[in-house]
């Protein structure tokens, strides 16, 4: 009896189920080949056609029958409907209107019809066609010309000259971009590891996560140097890979520059994307209402979505987290006057339909930027820089002497060494033997430079239409350029000229 119990237990553990007749061979059934295997082997035999004794084909091979099968057209009313056609003139007009609309940064595409847009858009790339080999000059322009009219892209010599100029400009821009690392035949200089901050794979992964999760992307720029803190490569990526996402420029720290400088930069950047001037402060902000109103408009453009996400990208230390705190009226993101405070992306709820995404600062690699440019943009922390006194001469060239004299209450220096020595002796920063602590004072000055205690800014480009447009001081908002443009107004012109000619005295601490 004990043996029987063990045998029953062993069978149960072995997984044997059923009545025990599963492995019994039935007569007439192939035991070694199943139906799938038999079908596969028969397919190998059917590969050739069958012929009779006279060599005539009796049965065609698989998929090689010459008999036409009976076809049947799907009954659909669209076969009998009108066909939509368009003339060439109307197509050209539509193509021009489409191009003008795409170039306008203040127009948004709400709905797109099912049209072959690839056929309507003009391809900027020149196809690699060997025209001379396919159509010779004699067959095109000579007495034996076979075409009535040569296929030219221009109509007269003026258009040909303008097309040649545009082609030359594009070629020079591309050449400068490709050969930016070649400077007078010298090779690229090795940079310190600290100047490669913001370029790690982790930071780029955070950036791509923010871009993929955002419906509206806000590019935060520093009002003192907007072009220096502009990520052109990220803009091109969004324009190419995600054209359905909306991009906005926010000119932060506009309180550190004069009003006419901020207004000129807003007008210049508005040619590419919608631009707003902003001052991040929980208690005393500027541009907050305009930004929230703009986000509400983008939210209204997508009524089918329950909410939209707004991502903040840009260089480190440009004030992305501070703008989010300003919009929420409380500290929801960790901020600091040093770069690299935000490590990972963070979701913040602004309202029921709008969410904000904070992103770490990104620094696109560029061979044109020197170590001085990277340091002055606030990308790296000054305390980690070796020999900070070597950057003081460039700082003296970028800042005016009167601003430095008023900030540090020293005067009468001829070079950077004397400037550091005077400030060190005034503040009592001396080493053994009465030697001035140049390194410590240089770090102090660089921190003041990045944090806005020393007034400086990059002048805006003087556009051709800027001469006829004046900005009245103290009227409207910087984001609303149409309300601030005053044409042929004598009183406003005099006020603007007085404001621009007035000496910029800096800012109070």
UniProtKB/Swiss-Prot annotation:
Primary place of residence?
Answer: nucleus
Cellular compartments annotated: Nucleus, Nucleolus
Signal sequence, start to end: none
- Keyword match Zinc: no
GO-annotated molecular function = GTP binding
| A GO-annotated cellular component | nucleolus
- Report the SS bond pairs: none
Per its UniProt record, what SUPFAM superfamilies does this chain match? P-loop containing nucleoside triphosphate hydrolases
Task: Give the GO biological process terms.
Answer: ribosome biogenesis
Span list, region Disordered:
1-22, 480-509
Q: Which residues form the CP-type G domain?
A: 204-365
Basic and acidic residues bias: start-end ranges: 1-14
Q: Which domain of life is it from?
A: Eukaryota
Keyword annotations for this protein?
GTP-binding, Nucleotide-binding, Nucleus, Ribosome biogenesis
InterPro entries membership: G_CP_dom, GNL2_CP_dom, GTP-bd, GTP-bd_ortho_bundle_sf, NOG2_N_dom, P-loop_NTPase, TRAFAC_YlqF/YawG_RiboMat
Name the Pfam families on file.
MMR_HSR1, NGP1NT
- Keyword Transmembrane helix appears in the UniProt entry: no
Binding-site residues for GTP, renumbered to this chain: 314-321, 358-362
- Family affiliation: Belongs to the TRAFAC class YlqF/YawG GTPase family. NOG2 subfamily.
Its biological purpose is as follows: GTPase that associates with pre-60S ribosomal subunits in the nucleolus and is required for their nuclear export and maturation.
Name under which the protein is recorded: Nucleolar GTP-binding protein 2
The protein's gene is named: NOG2
């Amino acid at each position: 009896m004990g043996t029987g119990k063990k045998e029953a237990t062993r069978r149960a553990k072995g997984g044997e189920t059923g009545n025990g007749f599963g492995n019994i061979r039935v007569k007439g059934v192939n035991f070694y080949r199943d139906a799938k295997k038999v079908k596969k082997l028969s397919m190998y035999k059917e590969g050739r056609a069958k012929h009779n004794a006279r060599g005539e084909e009796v049965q065609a091979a698989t998929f090689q029958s010459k008999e036409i099968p009976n076809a049947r057209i799907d009954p659909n009313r669209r076969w009998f409907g009108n066909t939509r056609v368009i003339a060439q003139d109307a197509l050209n007009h539509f193509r021009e209107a489409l191009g003008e609309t795409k170039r306008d940064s203040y127009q948004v595409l709400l709905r797109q019809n099912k049209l072959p847009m690839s056929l309507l858009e003009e391809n900027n790339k020149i196809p690699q066609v060997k025209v001379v080999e396919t159509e010779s000059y004699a067959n095109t322009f000579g007495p034996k010309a076979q075409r009535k009219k040569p296929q030219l892209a221009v109509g007269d010599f003026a258009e040909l000259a303008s097309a040649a100029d545009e082609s030359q400009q594009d070629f020079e821009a591309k050449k400068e971009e490709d050969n930016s690392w070649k400077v007078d035949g010298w090779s690229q200089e090795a940079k310190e590891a600290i100047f490669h901050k913001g370029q790690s794979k982790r930071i780029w992964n955070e950036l791509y996560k923010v871009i993929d999760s955002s419906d509206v992307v806000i590019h935060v720029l520093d009002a003192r140097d907007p072009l220096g803190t502009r990520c052109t490569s990220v803009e091109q990526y969004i324009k190419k890979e995600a054209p359905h996402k909306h991009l906005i420029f926010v000119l932060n720290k506009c309180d550190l520059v004069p009003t006419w400088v901020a207004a000129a930069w807003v007008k210049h950047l508005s040619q590419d994307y919608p631009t707003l001037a902003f001052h991040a402060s929980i208690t005393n902000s500027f541009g907050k209402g305009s930004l929230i109103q703009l986000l509400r408009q983008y939210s209204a453009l997508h009524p089918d979505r329950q909410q939209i996400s707004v991502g903040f990208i840009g260089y480190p230390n440009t004030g992305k987290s501070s703008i989010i705190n300003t919009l929420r009226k409380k500290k929801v993101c960790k901020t600091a006057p040093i770069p690299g405070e935000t490590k990972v992306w963070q979701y913040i709820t602004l309202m029921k339909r709008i969410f904000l995404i904070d992103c770490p600062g990104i620094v696109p690699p560029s061979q044109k930027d020197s170590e001085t440019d990277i340091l002055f943009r606030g990308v790296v922390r000054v305390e980690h820089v070796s020999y900070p006194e070597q950057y003081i001469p460039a700082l003296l060239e970028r800042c005016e002497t009167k601003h430095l004299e008023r900030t540090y209450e020293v005067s009468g220096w001829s070079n950077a060494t004397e400037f550091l020595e005077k400030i060190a002796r005034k503040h009592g920063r001396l080493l053994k033997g009465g030697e001035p602590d140049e390194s410590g004072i240089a770090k102090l000055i660089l921190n003041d430079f990045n944090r806005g205690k020393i007034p400086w800014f990059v002048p805006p480009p003087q556009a051709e239409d800027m001469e006829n447009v004046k900005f009245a001081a103290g009227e409207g908002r910087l984001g609303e350029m149409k309300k601030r443009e005053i044409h042929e107004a004598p009183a406003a012109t005099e006020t603007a000229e007085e404001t621009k000619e007035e000496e910029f005295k800096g800012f109070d601490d």
